[in-house]
Design a protein with these regions (language model features):
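A short glycine-rich, aromatic-capped structural motif
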Residues: 2-25, 33-125, 129-130, 135, ...
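Short, low-complexity, polar/charged sequence segments that are solvent-exposed and flexible
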Residues: 27, 72-75, 174, 190-191
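Short secondary-structure transition/capping segments
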Residues: 28-30, 114, 183-187
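Functional-site microenvironments in short loops/helix caps that host divalent-cation chemistry
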Residues: 56, 121-124, 132-202
């Protein structure tokens, strides 16, 4: 999502979408013009990107996150889900025994208020409004009518990690997530506060 959205299409290749969150950098009206390296844009051949995922290019990444300093990281190319996990998808994880199959939770260290918990004790805290394992806002182990395609909310990091393992994936590490979701230009000159005022969020 951003102010400028470009789509590149070529027969035999996956469509590539480019987003510019803050076009002031591109249109040269920023008070301190930044310098960018001009490089070719590589597209992925058809059949090389898993369904409902997108390919993120590797290379240098300077996250500039608060408290992290300005560190230069080199990331390898990777895939990330194109859409959020829906209530319906998470319900299938539950129905398939997600909270009962230990391999999805293996090697996790469950901590609450500074104390370690067993997997069994931790699961007792991962419950919905009726005490059944599931997202916090659900009732009797299911989402509300009409909300099957909404993004799932009210789950812990542990549950998200277990779901990712169930799908044969992992949760993206911090810097991989930042590179995919948060343009560096938004850090340098954020435009989100302006857009938020004009958004239709209640």
């Amino acid at each position: 999502r951003g102010v400028v959205h470009l789509k590149l299409s070529k027969e035999g290749f996956h469509t590539k979408e480019l987003v510019e969150a803050n076009p002031s950098f591109t249109f040269a009206n920023h008070p301190i013009p930044p310098t960018f390296e001009i490089s070719k844009i590589e597209m992925n051949k058809e059949g090389t990107v898993p369904d409902n995922m997108i390919a993120i290019d590797g290379g240098r990444f300077i996250p500039a996150l608060i408290g992290e300093g300005v560190t230069d990281y080199k990331l390898s190319p990777y895939f990330i889900d194109k859409f959020e996990v829906t209530n319906k998808q998470f319900k299938k994880f539950i129905d398939d025994g997600g909270y009962e199959i230990f391999q999805y939770w293996k090697d996790m260290e469950f901590i609450k208020d500074g104390e370690s918990l067993s997997w069994e004790d931790a699961k007792e805290l991962m419950v919905d409004s009726t005490g059944v394992n599931g997202p916090l806002s659900w009732e009797l182990g299911s989402y509300r009518n009409g909300e099957e395609n909404l993004p799932v909310t009210g789950i812990s990091w542990y549950e998200a990690q277990a779901y990712a393992r169930y799908k044969g994936n992992i949760l993206p590490p911090m810097y991989h997530w930042a590179k995919a979701a948060f343009p560096i230009t938004e850090i340098a000159a954020p435009i989100s506060p302006v857009l938020l005022k004009k958004s239709n969020f209640s």
